Amino acid sequence: MAELMAMGNDVVHVAVKSDVRESRSTLLWALRNLGAKKVCILHVYQPKTASPAARKLEELEAIMYETLHDYFDFCQQEGVNEDDIYISCIEMNDVKQGILELIHESKIKKLVMGAASDHHYSEKMFDLKSRKAKYVYQHAPSSCEVMFMCDGHLIYTKEANLEDCMGETESEAGQSKPKLYSSASPKCSAELVSAIVAYIDTRRDRDMLEPNASEDQSESDRNDQLYRQLKQALMEVEESKREAYEECVRRFKAENTAVEAIRSAREYEAMYNEEAKLRKEGKEALAKQRKMVEKTKQERDDALIIILNGRKLYNEELRRRVEAEEMLGKEKEEHERTKKEIEEVRAIVQDGTLYNEQLRHRKEMEESMKRQEEELEKTKKEKEEACMISKNLMQLYEDEVRQRKEAEELVKRRREELEKVKKEKEEACSVGQNFMRLYEEEARRRKGTEEELSKVAAEKDAASSVCSEILLLLQSYTRRHGTPSGFSDEDSVTRQPPSYFICPISQEVMREPRVAADGFTYEAESLREWLDNGHETSPMTNLKLAHNNLVPNHALRSAIQEWLQRNS
């Protein structure tokens, strides 16, 4: 404890709960953001009994180790040395009072504690929610800087008063003997050894600074020997105490394990008894249910047998009754019919109207025969007329069938013609594509020809001069000797233009050649007239043009102009 008081601001105190999951974020923030060399974990142990008796130091240390060893391991995982981790614990029912007690005992200058549980955190949280945090904020010494955390975020900081810090430091320096031991610290033995060694070193340094110390060498040797003996004794005490502490911890763990095992065994025994009881009751209930099911099934079978037998008897009785009713109905009908016939015969015999009735029937039959003959003649005439109409209708039907066949043949021929036209169009498209390819090749050849023509131009000029001289000689010769047979001026002058100089529409030499969408070259004016007259197809391929854009053919135009100049 004295060592922690002596280090002052180098130690960060963090108040934690017994469960590491509840205070892990607070401890992690303190280790990563405050940059302290040493850390001290504060914990207030709340006993389970309302009024706990005084505990021994070893028992309290065992409880602290059992409760806070997870924090110790967590600090080591974050890179803190084992010698730089301290644990300060106090046993008290009131947690906030315990925290204040630890602050006063350890003279804490910097404390980190929770402002509320982590699940209460929100971005708009700026106030303290926990009653313990509010109490510590109100009653903590002004020399202690307290930082309140929630879910790894700093919520509020209580700043320390520097004047009060200086006053407390001076008052601590004026004290003759510091408090070297605290029953609440599990490392009290190590702190005691460190404090005693520091005290002896201080005394030794002070004696060495005195003027007479250098003269008495024997006194110094004795002090050194005493110092070594004392240090050896303290190390043995420390080792013994550590072994006692470890034994206490092991015993405490063993007792807890035994108690837990006994409790678990009792719980398992109770659960087994309860399960056995439920199983027995379930078996009994299942046996009763099976008996009831068997009984119900037997009753159902008996009832079904009775119902089936009764239904058979009912159906048999119903069938007999229906047959008897049918026989009775037939006998009644036969009796009524016989009675009526007897009465009719009796009436005819008594009145003497049987003969008269026969005569009347004969006359009626003769009249009906005459009417039937007349109707037969009339029907015969109607049938003859109907036959003529049917014959005409048959002829009309045959004509219609013949016309229908002709129409079908015409449609078939039309389809064949359409397919043929379609094929011709496809062939024309392929021909147009070939023409385009040939035109491109012709353009390339023409370009080469133009280059050759430019080279031959000089030769032509020389040839023309020679020709002119020859013509002069020929003219002079003809004037002297006459014109030779089979030789005229027209044959020497007349020259026909190439076929690709002629427009396919006007059949004249083109002046402004333009390339259309079908790949052929036309005279610009003639092709515009063709398009203005409503034509949308190519004059050469008779296919629809993709567009009406005309591209000037400069190479062909220059060739035509050169030809015209030579033949002008």
Curated annotation (Swiss-Prot):
It comes from the Eukaryota. Its EC number is 2.3.2.27. It is an enzyme of class 2 (transferase). Residues 496-568 form the U-box domain. Gene3D superfamilies: HUPs, Zinc/RING finger domain, C3HC4 (zinc finger). Residues 217-464 form a coiled coil. GO terms for biological process: protein ubiquitination. Keywords: Coiled coil, Transferase, Ubl conjugation pathway. Pfam families: U-box (PF04564). InterPro entries: Rossmann-like_a/b/a_fold (IPR014729), U-box_ubiquitin_ligases (IPR051348), Ubox_domain (IPR003613), Znf_RING/FYVE/PHD (IPR013083). It catalyses: S-ubiquitinyl-[E2 ubiquitin-conjugating enzyme]-L-cysteine + [acceptor protein]-L-lysine = [E2 ubiquitin-conjugating enzyme]-L-cysteine + N(6)-ubiquitinyl-[acceptor protein]-L-lysine. One of its GO terms (molecular function) is ubiquitin-protein transferase activity. CDD domains: RING-Ubox_WDSUB1-like, USP_STK_Ubox_N. The keyword Transferase applies. Pathway: Protein modification; protein ubiquitination. Functions as an E3 ubiquitin ligase. This is Putative U-box domain-containing protein 55. It comes from Arabidopsis thaliana (Mouse-ear cress).
